[in-house]
């Protein structure tokens, strides 16, 4: 199904996911956010035409925090491509507002790379030590001991199901898995998972990331399982499906990125909807990029933010979090097609511009795994890729 953009259909997705979560019993404080947490609550205000704000009821960062952050002289982030969730604007606005330069490490890195960077630099306060991470949902609770708890001013407006009770990590945004296609190479973009096995896509199908370490790639395999006889409790059919894609000669063992998609090296890439849509906009039809949420196996994925327990700039890290979870920061993510975790609060106060809300893709029926399901699937996929699929996914040369 193509990315027809209607808020009503998105709300339908959220309601369906809310039902799913209601049926899944998991420990309090660790459940994945029900997509219903991002939909306008019944009877609340619709997105505003102009985005005029109503008070959030939350104070901004204190003058003491701002001064302490500025005194540290910088902030180190990791794995934040400027075109991912509109991070370019988020980064630039932070520096412009507070005068704090940002050292961005490994923009093409995976969630696994982010965790390894924290571990490798526990006693190193230098420029290679990240202050903050933006990682896949399953990486949050699993690595909680590496994070410094901190609750932002808008903490109470973040759904309980989307955060660690002590503030060690909390959801930031989410999207759905989609097919991003360079139509200059693949003139007939695939619409569903079964299409990826067709001979016309020989040497064209790629993952955005290594499924042994990348959250995005791991969850692409998980999504494939849902469309091929698996379930949220059984991701093995996803691995089996990719083995079929390889055997058909359709799989390209290259870590897809906007450059490889445009060049035609990875013309059909499995990526989050927000990555595909922002890439589509950036090419201005040269070439034309098509973004499709598949008909079956519709799968939603949440990311989380956390501060490293070993952050060289702990106050700058806290100020960064305040920036991200402010109304301003959340709307910047929305501009990049990412559904911010505080969406329902902002909609209820009438500050979400209608044009931004209307850009979210039609993803009716998408499901979100619980933390337990996601952990089990992640373990299976990361450990089973080599045995079942047997292909290395390599990063293309610069």
Residue ranges and their predicted role:
Residues 2-14:
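Bacterial N-terminal signal peptides that target proteins for export
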Residues 24-38:
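Bacterial lipoprotein signal-peptidase II cleavage site
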Residues 47, 51-62, 70-89:
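Extracytoplasmic "Venus flytrap"
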Residues 76-92, 103-119, 126-265, 279:
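Extracytoplasmic ligand-binding site segments that recognize negatively charged/polar headgroups
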């Amino acid at each position: 199904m193509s990315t027809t953009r209607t808020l009503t259909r998105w709300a339908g997705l959220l309601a369906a996911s809310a039902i799913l979560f209601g049926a899944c019993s998991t420990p309090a404080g660790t459940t994945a956010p029900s997509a219903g947490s991002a939909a306008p609550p019944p009877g609340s205000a619709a997105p505003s035409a102009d985005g005029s704000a109503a008070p959030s009821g939350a104070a901004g960062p204190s003058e003491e925090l701002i001064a302490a952050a500025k005194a540290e002289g910088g902030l180190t982030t990791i794995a934040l491509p400027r075109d991912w969730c509109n991070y370019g604007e988020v980064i630039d606005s932070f520096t412009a507002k507070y005068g704090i330069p940002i050292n961005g490490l490994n923009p093409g890195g995976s969630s696994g790379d982010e965790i390894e960077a924290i571990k490798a630099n526990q006693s190193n306060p230098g420029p290679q030590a990240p202050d903050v991470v933006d990682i896949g949902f399953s990486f949050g609770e699993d690595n909680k001991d590496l994070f410094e708890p901190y609750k932002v001013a808008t903490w109470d407006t973040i759904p309980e199901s989307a955060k660690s009770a002590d503030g060690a990590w909390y959801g930031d945004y989410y999207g759905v898995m989609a097919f991003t296609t360079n139509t200059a190479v693949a003139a007939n973009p695939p619409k569903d998972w079964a299409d990826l096995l067709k001979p016309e896509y020989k040497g064209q199908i790629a993952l955005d990331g290594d499924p042994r370490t990348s959250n995005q790639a791991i969850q692409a395999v998980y999504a494939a399982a849902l469309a091929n006889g698996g379930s949220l409790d059984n991701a093995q059919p996803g691995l089996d499906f990719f083995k079929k894609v390889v055997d058909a000669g359709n799989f390209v063992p290259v870590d897809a990125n906007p450059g490889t998609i445009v060049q035609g090296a990875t013309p059909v890439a499995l990526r989050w909807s927000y990555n595909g849509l922002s890439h589509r906009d950036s090419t201005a039809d040269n070439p034309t990029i098509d973004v499709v949420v598949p008909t079956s196996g519709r799968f939603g994925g949440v990311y989380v933010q956390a501060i490293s327990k070993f952050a060289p700039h702990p106050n700058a890290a806290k100020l960064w979090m305040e920036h991200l979870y402010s109304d301003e920061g959340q709307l910047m993510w929305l501009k990049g097609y990412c559904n911010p975790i505080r969406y329902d609060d902002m909609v209820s106060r009438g500050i979400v511009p209608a044009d931004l809300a209307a850009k979210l893709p039609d993803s009716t029926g998408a499901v979100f795994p619980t933390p337990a399901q996601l952990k089990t699937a992640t373990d299976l996929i990361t450990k089973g890729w080599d045995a079942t699929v047997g292909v290395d996914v390599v990063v293309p040369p610069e």
